[in-house]
């Protein structure tokens, strides 16, 4: 994956997150500033998802901790094999929103 594809892929992830959270009625605010996408929940807690361009990785930080994902075989996967979307759903639940992706 080249740099342009990396950015396009992550921006697609961010767009999907924002659209699905809205469609599912989640009480959140989403904001993008540069390479950082922040989801603020009704209880004022946050999930932060950011691009790590030098490593071509997607990072997520939440109440559950920090996780790093690389794009492998068409999806974002951590070193231990966890899929990004599974991690994201678990993180949302930890912040008080039950969503499906």
From Swiss-Prot:
What keywords would UniProt list here?
Iron, Metal-binding
Instruction: Say if the entry is tagged with keyword Secreted.
Output: no
Q: Which GO terms describe its cellular component?
A: cytosol
Which Gene3D superfamilies does the protein's record reference? Frataxin/CyaY (3.30.920.10)
Q: Which GO terms describe its molecular function?
A: ferric iron binding; ferrous iron binding
GO annotation (BP), single? iron-sulfur cluster assembly
**Pfam families attached here?**
Frataxin_Cyay
**What does this protein's UniProt record list under function?**
Involved in iron-sulfur (Fe-S) cluster assembly. May act as a regulator of Fe-S biogenesis.
Q: Which family does it belong to?
A: Belongs to the frataxin family.
Q: What is this protein called?
A: Iron-sulfur cluster assembly protein CyaY
**Organism of origin:** Haemophilus influenzae (strain PittEE)
The taxonomic lineage of its organism, from the top, reads: Bacteria, Pseudomonadati, Pseudomonadota, Gammaproteobacteria, Pasteurellales
